[in-house]
């Protein structure tokens, strides 16, 4: 009996030792080499892919390292290649329903993916990636990533066509949440092509950090405490946009994916630069909207919100220097777009010399051009000469003698509905030189065949040396601009423009009455000149006071058009020249089918 019990005890102890040693055998190098070969063979037999592993090492309790791994597709294209993959897990936490990942690290890793029809190609070449002390709570469906780093990355995405953002009707969002302590990026380059819409979209980031983030996959929301991008370089080259492919139709069992909610408490960009360039564009002097290059971009946005088409961007600071030399030093304001419409509130932009402030609000019907959409615009600006010639350098010669800080002042107010807009005021002035004021109304602005409107204006020119400075030398010595007042009004209908304008200087008056049929290209009018002092404008010539009247009419605008017809009948009641007064002069001129005739 004692021997039987002894044998039973030996068997039980042997089984126990065997059960304990079998799991530990996976830490034996020979067993690991055998397991490496078995894994490679199984992947080949089950997927048709080819897996090659240089070295596999597993250390207690669970620290796995795989060196020189290569995974090839059945067509022998590289899907994954890495010099080193390290994974460290605490197995004891599994008993509590948690996966505690002590470390995941990738070194010199290449990933390439191409779908079956080659409309999508994604590749990522990662120098170093690591995450430490991560935790996966299997009971609460929560993932915690306290610290993640990506150093050196080359990411490329090529799309031949875009697919609609849809999900299966039977699918449901995953009930998982992810919390992020810090994500650090350095030396990352991203490139995207989606021809013909996008020729190339390129982004290089020297350093970026994301702090305290929360991702709710079920609620489809992302919340970030702070995002910082330092020394980013962004380049966008749009394509031709001529895609003749037929648009894809959604399958009957798909629905549009609900929008994600993205909230960023603090967004900061420091020392960034950006380029927008049309294909084959040769940059022009000044501000070229086909070639925009911004440098030293500084952005500060607090409480950024986006959910589908809803967006709120409270701009705390925006500064940059454009290639033309325009340097924006300060920008503030809040842009919002939601179901009620769009608005730009408390917007202010400054350069060293200029400033612009604006308040803009429009109802959501602005997107569908609904005539009942309410619209309100308030705009005030001071545009300095120094900034204007940077934007339009071709006018530099016309600003001689003007201080660069001299500024055009404007104050514009509009309100009403899209189908019935009122121009409350449009005041534009150059202090000491001119003042212009206008009011008006326009109806059916978005419908060219139904448009109607009216405009009233007044322009006062002052006796300023500015006019002589902006004229060429050959004219500045001959022409003088005395105090002059321009007034007028115009009425616009779908086919007709009617206008009345007057010019007053001294005791003289010029009145213009005109009509233009825009559809038939027909026009007629009268010009009445009453004692107008030509000598005030041409002081070095021999002309004096002029009184005259002119009638004109015609059809077509181009004199080279064989169907053009025009007549001009000028009657001079009196004109002073070289101290003599001439009266009773008349001049007639006619252009008919390319033939000109006239008489005095």
Predicted regions and their residues:
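Flexible beta-edge/linker motif
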Residues: 55-160, 171-240, 253-274, 295-316, ...
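Outer-membrane beta-barrel pore domains and translocons
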Residues: 151, 230, 318, 349-350, ...
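Sequence/structural signature of outer-membrane beta-barrel proteins
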Residues: 111-114, 195, 532-536, 573-577
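Transmembrane beta-strands of outer-membrane beta-barrel proteins
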Residues: 225, 375-377, 453, 499, ...
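Amphipathic hydrophobic-ligand
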Residues: 46, 75-88, 117-131, 144-145, ...
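N-terminal type II signal-anchor transmembrane helix
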Residues: 1-48
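Transmembrane beta-strand segments that form the barrel wall of outer-membrane beta-barrel proteins
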Residues: 314-318, 341-348, 421-428, 495-503, ...
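Outer-membrane beta-barrel proteins
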Residues: 157-159, 236-238, 356, 388-392, ...
